């Protein structure tokens, strides 16, 4: 138990250090006499609680907001880099995010079948959005890549075979239909 408390205290100190230059959090810290880490963690818990409770449908807008803002921030940073590793992560995220939004639009029954849908969706989106988790890469390798290879890239292979057959038939004088 002491290890858990020590680990939490270390992580809270890291949060305080990370947000040391944030003017808004510095002002809130001065007014409330609470460390920045407590303010960040408390705000995050409150935000997720609002999504979980979903009073008046607020869970939908808050979940989609979190699912958009954090990856949009990372996307803007990725545009400034020269590597493609972060690009693949983010493109995969945006594919999954768009897919979920299309399904939600056409299947409102899904929202009633799955309890706490907006909360679960938000947790899932955060899992695949944050580069530290590698969630988008896992989703891409396990689900998106096999589907795209089979249904999108598959016909191009047969188109190449058909083209080869046509060229061979022209060369030999055989008729094709």
UniProtKB/Swiss-Prot annotation:
Top-level lineage group: Eukaryota
Biological processes, Gene Ontology terms: endoplasmic reticulum inheritance; endoplasmic reticulum tubular network membrane organization; ER-dependent peroxisome organization; nuclear pore complex assembly; response to endoplasmic reticulum stress; vacuole organization; vesicle-mediated transport
Main location: endoplasmic reticulum
Ranges facing Cytoplasmic side: 1-35, 79-88, 128-177
Listed GO CC annotations: cell division site; cortical endoplasmic reticulum; endoplasmic reticulum membrane; Golgi membrane; nuclear envelope
Keyword Endoplasmic reticulum carried by entry: yes
Subcellular compartments: Endoplasmic reticulum membrane; Golgi apparatus membrane
Membrane-spanning intervals of the chain: 36-55, 58-78, 89-103, 109-127
Alphabetical list of Pfam families matching this protein: TB2_DP1_HVA22
Residues exposed to the Lumenal side: 56-57, 104-108
Subunit composition and interactions: Oligomer.
Known role: Required to generate and maintain the structure of the tubular endoplasmic reticulum network and the vacuole. Induces high curvature in membranes and causes membrane tubule formation. Involved in membrane/vesicle trafficking.
Family in the record: Belongs to the DP1 family.
Protein name, as recorded: Protein YOP1
Organism whose genome encodes this protein: Candida glabrata (strain ATCC 2001 / BCRC 20586 / JCM 3761 / NBRC 0622 / NRRL Y-65 / CBS 138)
